[in-house]
C-alpha cells in the first residue's frame, strides 16, 4: 500500500501540472504520505501551467517537460493565444530545440580542398603576372636597382595601410627582435636586387633556370655552414639539377655573365636568408615578420639605388621611359609590379601554412614551370633544343630533390611526435 499511495500521489501531481484552471484544495482530504503532500503542494503552486493533455503520441508527459527553459518562476498566461503558444512550445520535441542551436558549417569548412586550390591558383597567377610585367618594364626602363626599391616600397605601403585598418593587427617589435631580423632582411634585400639585375639582363626563362640551383646552395650551406649532415639521396638528386642548368647555359641565346653571376649571387643570398631565418624564429605571425623584413630591406636598398642609378635616372632615365610609354603607364606599371610582387610572396606564405611541406615543394616546382612556359610564350623567346632539354632536366631534378627532402622532414616529425 505505501507504494500504491506514492504512485497515486505522483499521478495527482502530474494531473495538477496539466490542468489549466487553478485547483481548489479540499481541507477534508488527508495526505498521510509526505510525498503525496509535497506533490499536492507543487500542483497547487503550478496549477496555472497551460493544459497540454496528459498523453502525447501515447506517452505520459513528465512535469519537467512543461517547465520553461529560462527562469525558475512560472508566469500565468495572459491570453488564450499565449496559452496555445505555450502549449506548442511545451509539446515540441527536444530534438527540434537542439537542432536550432547547431551552427551550420561555413564554406571554408565544407570545401577546404577548393580553398587550397584557390590559394595555389592565386600564387601561380600572381607570380606569372609579376614576372611578365617586370620583364616588360625592363624592356623600356632598364634600371633594376630602382625597380627593386619600388617593389619593396609598394609592399611597405601595403603593409602600413593593412596595419592601419587592423588587417592584420600590427605585432609589437623591440630592439632584440630587430637585431634578429636585420640579417634576414639584409640577405633578402641582396637576393632581391641581384634577382632583378638578372631578370633585366637575360631572358626570364633562363634566369629561372639558373635559380633552380638554389636547392644545391641550400644543401651545401646546411652541410658546411650549419654542420648538419645532408643525406646521400639528396645530394644525388641534385646532380640532374646541376647538369640541366649547365646544358641550358651553354646554348642559351640570351646568356651574359652579368645575368648569370647575379642569379648565382641571388641563390646564395636566399640560402643565407633561410639560415638566418631559422636562427631568428619568433612567435610573430608570418605576415608581420614579412612586413618588418620588407621595411628593413627597403631601407637597405635605397642607398645603392641612389648611388648606382640616381645620376642616370635624373639625366635621361625617367624622361626616356615617359617618352616611350607615357607617364600614366609608366607610373601604373611600377605600382602594379610592386603590388604583384608583395601579394605573390604573401600568398606563397599563406599557401605554405595551409598544406604539407611536400605539397608546397611540388607546387613550387610547378610554379617555376608555369613561369618559364608563359614567359617563352609571351615574349617569344627563341631557345635551342639543348637549352630546352637542359631546362627540363633541371626542373625534374628540383622536383626529385623537393620530394625526397619533404619525405625526410615528414619522417623526422613522425619520429619526434
UniProtKB/Swiss-Prot annotation:
Q: Where is the transit peptide?
A: 1-40
Annotated InterPro entries: Sugar_P_trans_dom, Tpt_PEP_transl, TPT_transporter
Q: One Pfam family from the UniProt entry?
A: TPT
List the transmembrane segments: 113-133, 146-166, 180-200, 230-250, 257-276, 289-309, 321-341, 360-380, 383-403
Which body tissues produce this protein? Answer: Expressed in stems and leaves.
Positions of the UniProt region annotated as Disordered: 75-100
Q: Which GO CC annotations does the UniProt entry carry? A: chloroplast membrane; Golgi apparatus
What is a biological process (GO) this protein takes part in? transmembrane transport
Give the coiled coil ranges.
none
- State any single GO MF term: carboxylic acid transmembrane transporter activity
Topology within the bilayer = Multi-pass membrane protein
Q: Which keywords belong to this entry?
A: Chloroplast, Membrane, Plastid, Sugar transport, Transit peptide, Transmembrane, Transmembrane helix, Transport
**Role played:** Triose phosphate/phosphate translocator that may function in the export of photoassimilates from chloroplasts during the day.
Protein name, please? Triose phosphate/phosphate translocator TPT, chloroplastic
